[in-house]
């Protein structure tokens, strides 16, 4: 059933001066109840502030998590998702069991 699928559209966004940010996988559709792992990596910069956003159908971007350093993660919205930052330029978004309310487009950003 279409309603039981979670669609994630991810992309690669480019910064300036050879600085890049990559999200992996680029596109993902997961059924409700399955696990999730999305990875964001930044190249060409050090000590970036990293952010995970979600855009649900018909809504604007919602900040989910932000991190100012390794192991320093703040959550804006309590939910079924979690984030980890195992390395300076890596930020991982995950869920052990997706809910229908997790549906949306996910975007990683840095500053």
Swiss-Prot record:
A cellular-component GO term for this protein: plasma membrane
Residues in coiled coil: none
UniProt domain Ig-like: residue ranges: 19-111
The keyword Methyltransferase belongs to this UniProt entry's keyword annotation: no
Alphabetized CDD domains for the sequence: IgV
Disulfide bonding pattern of the chain: 40-108
Glycan-bearing residues: 80
InterPro entries tied to this protein: Ig-like_dom (IPR007110), Ig-like_dom_sf (IPR036179), Ig-like_fold (IPR013783), Ig_V-set (IPR013106), TCR_beta_variable (IPR050413)
Keywords per UniProt: Adaptive immunity, Cell membrane, Disulfide bond, Glycoprotein, Immunity, Immunoglobulin domain, Membrane, Receptor, Signal, T cell receptor
GO biological process: adaptive immune response; cell surface receptor signaling pathway
Signal peptide boundaries: 1-18
Primary subcellular site in the record, as a coarse category: membrane
Subcellular location per the Swiss-Prot or TrEMBL entry: Cell membrane
Entry keyword annotation includes Disulfide bond: yes
Subunit-structure text: Alpha-beta TR is a heterodimer composed of an alpha and beta chain; disulfide-linked. The alpha-beta TR is associated with the transmembrane signaling CD3 coreceptor proteins to form the TR-CD3 (TcR or TCR). The assembly of alpha-beta TR heterodimers with CD3 occurs in the endoplasmic reticulum where a single alpha-beta TR heterodimer associates with one CD3D-CD3E heterodimer, one CD3G-CD3E heterodimer and one CD247 homodimer forming a stable octameric structure. CD3D-CD3E and CD3G-CD3E heterodimers preferentially associate with TR alpha and TR beta chains, respectively.
Role noted for this protein: V region of the variable domain of T cell receptor (TR) beta chain that participates in the antigen recognition. Alpha-beta T cell receptors are antigen specific receptors which are essential to the immune response and are present on the cell surface of T lymphocytes. Recognize peptide-major histocompatibility (MH) (pMH) complexes that are displayed by antigen presenting cells (APC), a prerequisite for efficient T cell adaptive immunity against pathogens.
Protein name: T cell receptor beta variable 30
Organism of origin: Homo sapiens (Human)
Lineage: Eukaryota, Metazoa, Chordata, Craniata, Vertebrata
